[in-house]
């Protein structure tokens, strides 16, 4: 007798909203999902704020969502931990942060603060940058420079001017710091090995090459004049007397204050790896600190806030129970179904196979809303035919990645393609008397319009997400669940007792 696979299908960025305006989820033609919502038990889950270990009212995101789902418990996020340490004062005693500042003071070298200057709270927070400036001032550092990456995805697309202005006012007030470069996150924070983008950011940081401006505010307005919003600001060097304010040089200290790893890794590698093949560059000798651990294999890097260890995540526990599992996603979300789902552990568990499907090489995903969903689907259907896996974790990236473009019609098409794909997968699993749980990690494409301004919205939302139980067995689901309740539910269906570390509760009544 063949296996009865249990699949968790994560529709990334697929939230629930009753409002029709800008709701690509509601507008999409999705006969399969509509049928499942009528036929099968379903509920809604909290996927933002306190429900996922973030500050109240803070939108969820993919890293946080997958961490909470995989851990089966509320995972208190780096944003919360770092903010708390600033408020309570431990931040200013952090040995690793202090060592970077001390290195600059002792050697009379520069202290460079790199990161996303945004209160979005997904990759970084401006309050953490302000905390670093306070620390530098306390320690007597005088040569402190900010390399500002502009957002436009987790906040409105043209809001950088406001955040840069706020930072320039703070610099004036505290009497320390200068903005040296401005780069859109499209360049500085690529995560898909598009090294030609990262190279432009690197050239601005290290060689002072790129667009030129007399101030950070001017860099932003120049970009707007050229029709480029915050995410796409071409790396720009701020000049004084026709010379760069500064560049990153041998002997300097660098603190990369992004706390989310996935979009900080590539630039960190370019600045630190002994052997680097992304593009031609000279290896610098730096005191380089990252706010959190971006990747255990990074060379020449010190970590200020180490990751917490989560014992008995879903993947680890299922492996201990001698069950086999498959993780599958396209490049954009591969780290989420592997590294983040496993509690920040890179190595696969025993009997955990992985399928990485390359994401399409397009400038922005509105140009190809289907992304690689059909390739993911055909691969997982082939794997199901092998009758090998007890559990499959699958992520469809489209609703999130296309939702981030702010282009409604593209997001609608993205959801329609995902609906077509998931219909094929669900049919196959039901044929095998298996179970499919359909959920999301956070909202996005259900709100493509900023209700207050009418402008396109590119950020995540605080909306709840669906949880569908698609199976030939009938059951009832409870209300008021959170993402941490998904793993205990999966274990119950697999006939496994949940480990004591999982504090989430099964959603089955």
Swiss-Prot record:
Name of the top EC class for this enzyme: isomerase
InterPro entries for this protein: Alkaline_phosphatase_core_sf, BPG-indep_PGM_N, Metalloenzyme, PGAM_B_sf, Pgm_bpd_ind
CDD domains: iPGM
UniProt catalytic activity: (2R)-2-phosphoglycerate = (2R)-3-phosphoglycerate
Its biological purpose: Catalyzes the interconversion of 2-phosphoglycerate and 3-phosphoglycerate.
Subunit structure: Monomer.
Protein name per the record: 2,3-bisphosphoglycerate-independent phosphoglycerate mutase
